[in-house]
Regions:
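N-terminal/domain-start segments enriched in small and hydrophobic, helix-friendly residues
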Residues: 123
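Conserved, well-structured interaction surfaces
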Residues: 115-118
Length: 206
């Protein structure tokens, strides 16, 4: 092996990193007299950028699948900060391509992996198929996604209705990774799954 004298080793003076994310234009700015607010906003925007690629991921350090709950939970922040006119269309087309014949919308889209149970069928995730077009309309005054994907939306609502007992939907992951002390993360621990599942059911039929 080759051994070099320590004095000959290169010296690291600076490291720069660059965000790699898709081409959604950044459309807004935020500035206040409070640096905590400014830095918090910058952190949030950078976190959203880090998750925007061909799909919207839920954590940039490891997750590479398009978990759909992130689309509507982060939706307002995304719409306020970025132009989603093409990205939202792409997400809805992925949802259409992934939707099963019975109307189920998988938790991830595109469905590169077929999971089991709540990791494939959870109302809090699948409801993005209905919430996203209406959110698009709310922010842009553009009903094109509702018109184009109405069949997808209706099929999903009909599917959820078929799973309900006395208008209560009881399946899925619920409030995934809610707070717990000294226990592994997982399916909702503090909130009954039927509560959040049915809440999302009512959101999509409203």
């Amino acid at each position: 092996f080759l051994e070099k004298d320590k004095e000959e080793l290169p010296i690291l003076y600076n490291i720069e990193s660059h965000f790699v994310y898709n081409s959604n234009p950044h459309t807004s700015t935020f500035n206040s007299s409070n640096e905590i607010f400014n830095n918090t906003h910058r952190l949030i925007v950078n976190a959203m950028k880090s998750n925007m690629h061909a799909v919207f991921t839920d954590c940039p350090h490891r997750e590479k699948l398009g978990w759909l709950e992130q689309v509507h939970l982060n939706g307002p922040g995304l719409f306020y900060n970025f132009n989603l006119s093409t990205f939202a269309q792409k997400i809805m087309q992925d949802i259409r391509d992934s939707q099963l014949e019975n109307g189920l919308v998988p938790d991830i889209s595109p469905e590169y992996v077929i999971f089991d149970d709540g990791f494939r069928d959870s109302p809090e995730w699948g409801s993005a198929s209905v919430i996203m077009p209406f959110m698009y309309y709310e922010f842009y005054g553009d009903s094109s996604l509702i018109v184009e994907y109405y069949d997808v939306m209706k099929k999903y609502v009909d599917y959820l209705s078929s799973t309900a007992t006395n208008n209560i939907v009881s399946h899925g992951l619920g409030d995934w990774c809610d707070y717990r002390e000294n226990e592994p993360y997982g399916v909702s621990h503090n909130t009954p799954v039927p509560l959040s599942a049915s809440a999302h059911y009512y959101m999509v039929v409203d």
